[in-house]
């Protein structure tokens, strides 16, 4: 029998499973299950100050309990340290114009769909279950004055996000730094 293992970031207890999660299978022979792989979008800056959106894997999962007697689950500890958690609701037709993220931050849509467009022209639409890491603080204005990323709502109505800001410096030229 095939069992689906729910995998995702253990950042927020109400985080739904990403549509981009690859689940492990149990062959029924008491063999260890293969760890899952899930994905996030990384908005990062290169050494020329240009932002990019790259789809990145998370795949260093271990099967363990979060707290006994709970059953084991796949977890991948990505960050340990100070963080700030913010719930945001972007109004209908919200347009974020070109801007940088204020901090290195994970952004998790809970309701509705929004988009991020990097300076290189890559545009990604994200909805519930998708995960984004915003780290474009070290971008430089291009010829049109664009810096960071363009963001806005795709769907009608409000878009609800959970934002987890990390107390750490942004990197440069490190796409997919959380692996």
Describe each region flagged by the PLM.
Residues 1-3:
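N-terminal secretory signal peptides that target proteins for export/translocation
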Residues 7-18:
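Bacterial N-terminal signal peptides
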Residues 23-82, 176-179:
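A short, N-terminal "cap"/entry segment at the start of jelly-roll beta-barrel domains
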Residues 58-61, 68-71, 83-101, 126, ...:
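Conserved short histidine dyad/triad with adjacent acidic residue
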Residues 64, 139-151:
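Short, Lys/Arg- and Gly-enriched loop/turn segments at beta-strand edges
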Residues 89-90, 100-116:
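Short, conserved beta-strand element in jelly-roll/cupin
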Residues 120-138:
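Short acidic-glycine-tyrosine-enriched beta hairpin
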Residues 133, 146-170:
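A short hydrophobic beta-strand segment most commonly corresponding to one strand
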């Amino acid at each position: 029998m095939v069992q689906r293992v729910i995998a995702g970031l253990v950042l927020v207890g109400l985080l739904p499973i990403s549509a981009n999660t690859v689940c492990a299978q149990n062959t029924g022979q008491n063999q260890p299950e293969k760890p899952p792989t899930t994905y996030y979008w990384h908005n990062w800056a290169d050494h020329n100050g240009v932002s990019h959106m790259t789809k990145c894997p998370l795949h260093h999962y271990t099967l363990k309990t979060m707290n006994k007697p709970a059953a084991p689950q796949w977890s991948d500890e990505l960050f340990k340290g100070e963080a700030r958690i913010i719930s945001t609701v972007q109004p209908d037709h919200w347009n974020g114009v070109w801007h940088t993220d204020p901090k290195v931050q994970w952004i998790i849509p809970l309701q509705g769909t929004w988009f991020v467009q990097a300076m290189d022209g890559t545009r990604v639409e994200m909805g519930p279950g998708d995960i984004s890491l915003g780290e474009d603080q070290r971008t430089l204005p291009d010829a049109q004055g664009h810096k960071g990323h363009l963001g806005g709502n795709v769907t009608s109505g409000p878009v609800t996000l959970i934002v987890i800001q990390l107390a750490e410096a942004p990197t440069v030229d490190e796409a997919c730094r959380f692996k």
